[in-house]
Amino acid sequence: MSYLLAIDQGTTSTRCVVYDEELNIVHSAQQAYPLIYPEDGWVEVNPSELLASVYQTLDPMLDLSLEIVCAGITNQRETTLVWDAHSGEPVCNGIVWQDRRTAAHCNALKDQSLESVIQAKTGLLLDPYFSASKISWILNNVEGARARAEAGNLRFGTVDSFLLWHLSGGTIHKTDVTNASRTSLFNINTLQWDGELLEIFDVPLSMLPEVCSSDADFGSFCRMNQTIPITGMIGDQQSALVGQRCFDSGDMKATFGTGCFLMVNSGLTPQSSQSGLLSTIGYQLSGDVHYALEGSIFSAGTIIQWLRDNMQFFQDSKSSIELLSHSGQSNGTLFIPAFTGIGAPHWNAEVRAAFYGITRDTSQQDMVTAAFKSLIYQVIDIKDALQEDGINIQSLAVDGGMVTNEKFCQLLSDFLELDIHVPASTESSAIGAAITAGIGHGLFSSKQELKQASRHLTVYSPRDGIRDARDLERWREFLQLLMQIYK
């Protein structure tokens, strides 16, 4: 039997999974690593620790001595790394997608009326979230970086490119269309790096990787006496779209990981949002480029980690389930989880997190429930924005670590007033990487074949009388007040 390898490089951990041809998990390993918070709004990663987490999870998979015929890489998007073209040595820590240090730069470009130009070409808004302003910051703030870049001696990559570079021994500098589409430098209409965007952000073209389809031949890597072709690379949220088999226009998924990302397949042409959502590339498989609309929420699992590590409300994330109210009642307590600003559809980089409505009677359960509801309320805002853009939502497929919490899934269904579909394996990004690589290698004949294969799903249906419209209205008023305070 042939086997597929998925390298799933996430914001706080790396996971490697071996699948058989029917996409059953054969073996997996996971390794966490720390993020670095040098200043308010700054989030970094040590490139060496990130790379070490990949090898620590990859080597046990290779040690199985199975016939792994291809590998796929999926990765946290937008996180920005710059390294020496000859030695591979990073010039500084990686700047993580959550980092907001370039807010002033983005605001200055908005003042020059450049946001509409950027949005028309990239489908993205002007926000520190995306890679371009992060590259500019590195070139302008790391000593000697700009001169080295202009001399052709530096390379930029999102995490996929960085991993491919190192796995290939520094011989391959490529990315795929999904990761390129998150940089604010890639024109999603022409499928090329855009000269005007490079000029706006002052980034030399020589730094950038070659852009390929998601199921391209990305070369191979040799490790532990094995040579494995890499036939798939795809950003993690797009990989979850593939993993959930969202191959038809209108298919939609939401991934609840470090952040939360709702994505709907919008077909073969880009659809511009009028409601604060992003137009992006969903995937390019078997030649066809499928586009997507996306709503990005910056904090999801991060909220639970903060309640655990900083507030010490519980010892492990699973214990948060015990403190989550079954009915979603938080006794007037509200929470805005803007640790690094707020994402779609509001896009405010300055606002910060806050609780509201705390009294002497407020309990840990009230605060934990308010925190979970703050995520659900953001999902409702994105659902409403999608409907304003003409997307008719009948149900929602979900995945990611948080959806193993049955109480959360039930409340999500109650408040969204939708059926929630949870797959048996909630790690859709890893499955998507395996599917992408399998298509690239020729193991799967068609996307529809994969979609029609039976999958076990758990379905949560909304209960009557749980959603509190007044509580949602108060939460929205509180968010608007905070955005005014931090204006």
Which functions belong to the PLM regions below?
Residues 1-30, 37, 69-112, 146, ...:
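Glycine/Thr-rich phosphate-binding loops that ligate phosphate moieties of nucleotide
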Residues 34-44, 117-118, 174-181, 359-366:
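Gly-rich Lys/Arg/Thr-decorated short loops/hinges at beta-loop-alpha junctions or inter-strand turns
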